[in-house]
Amino acid sequence: MADYRLLIASSAAKELDAIGTKKDRRRIVVRIQGLAGEPRPLGCQKLTAREQYRIRSGQYRIVYEIDDAGRSVTVVKIGHRKGVYR
């Protein structure tokens, strides 16, 4: 199985830069990189009423879209679990 291409929305990149600790940012980047090989990893959840998925990374959530035809994953939002879905 070929890897998917990773794309990160500019708003998601800004949200990643705003995350407080280097350790949390590093953990999130590793989770995002893992999406290239497996866009639907164990523990991912499809969001209700949207064509988006989310994965957990500690106290943070990564929201992304999958384009199977174009073989790409686009990260659209990264945020703390309390406010990421608003």
Language-model-detected regions and their locations in the chain:
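Enriched for short, Lys/Arg-rich terminal
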Residues: M1-V29, R56-S57, E65-R86
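A short, surface-exposed loop/turn module that caps and links secondary-structure elements
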Residues: V30-I55
